[in-house]
Amino acid sequence: MHNLYSITGYPDPPGTMEEEEEDDDYENSTPPYKDLPPKPGTMEEEEEDDDYENSTPPYKDLPPKPGTMEEEEEDDDYENSTPPYKDLPPKPGSSAPPRPPRAAKETEKPPLPCKPRNMTGLDLAAVTCPPPQLAVNLEPSPLQPSLAATPVPWLNQRSGGPGCCQKRWMVYLCLLVVTSLFLGCLGLTVTLIKYQELMEELRMLSFQQMTWRTNMTGMAGLAGLKHDIARVRADTNQSLVELWGLLDCRRITCPEGWLPFEGKCYYFSPSTKSWDEARMFCQENYSHLVIINSFAEHNFVAKAHGSPRVYWLGLNDRAQEGDWRWLDGSPVTLSFWEPEEPNNIHDEDCATMNKGGTWNDLSCYKTTYWICERKCSC
């Protein structure tokens, strides 16, 4: 009866409201009018599933929509099914109040396929099924969250992303390089300064060493020079004495204070000196310490001094111990040594003549009188 009234356009008889509410075959009935609220879980799903082929599949970890688990399992042939009517006009003469929305069932069936019914007397609009879209829609689905908007937990909001972190590391690296260069330059500068100080100290030490060597060489050279001067002077005086003796002079005379004997002059000193000082005095006066070559000469000298004084002779063994020689280098041919002399006690290397004309060895550094000998001058 409900269908008859619906076809003829008459209002529903009383009692049909409860029958419609109790109609368990609600999902197989004619789609509701536009002024009725959609069935929970069906209209929005159809609107969202219009672009099902072009939509991006949801994340695997997203929970399923309420009441759609069994629909996804049952709607395997959703792409080949006919979409339901969406723009059906309301029934003529129907003034029934809008139905309250029913609670969503746990198990819902897919919507009816797009199939026209033989309804006479109704002004139904033409229903067109949209062709399936084969193109891929690149626009993100409204239910699918955007990848750009997904927050990443390991990135800090203040860091500004990986680019900002990379810039920060670049800044740290630049600061490290600049610091390393500065420390390297500072170390090089300190090393150069220390090197210059060490080189300056080395030059000063080299200069001091050179000065010390020069002084030592100068002192040694000065001592050698003095020795050479003394030797040259002695040789010169000896040459002059010999030259004067060779000259043919008419009158042979001796200097004042000198005693002549067989063409020679002898000087007996009134003061005392060491052996070296006495030798130097004789050389300065163109003479030498007395050299005895004969008994007559020895007797003249022993008698001439006539006093208990001890005089230096020109005899010594400095070159070799025990080898006594005169100043002219000749060995001793006549010996007038006292008994047990020479004994070389206390480094006694020079010879003296005592009061009786005997010889004795004495240290060259002691002081006593001396006798000089030279040839007579004309």
From Swiss-Prot:
The keyword Thylakoid does not apply. GO terms for cellular component: cell surface; external side of plasma membrane. Pfam families: Lectin_C. Phosphorylated on tyrosine residues. The chain crosses the membrane at residues 173-193. Glycans are attached at N215, N237, N285. Residues 86-101 have a biased composition (Pro residues). Disulfide bonds join C254-C265, C282-C372, C350-C364. It comes from the Eukaryota. Residues 1-119 are annotated as: Disordered. The keyword Cell inner membrane does not apply. Residues 261-373 form the C-type lectin domain. InterPro entries: C-type_lectin-like (IPR001304), C-type_lectin-like/link_sf (IPR016186), C-type_lectin/snaclec_domain (IPR050111), C-type_lectin_CS (IPR018378), CD209-like_CTLD (IPR033989), CTDL_fold (IPR016187). Residues 194-378 are extracellular. One of its GO terms (molecular function) is fucose binding. SMART domains: CLECT. GO terms for biological process: immune response. Cell surface receptor which may be involved in carbohydrate-mediated communication between cells in the germinal center. Binds glycans with terminal alpha-linked mannose or fucose residues. This is C-type lectin domain family 17, member A.
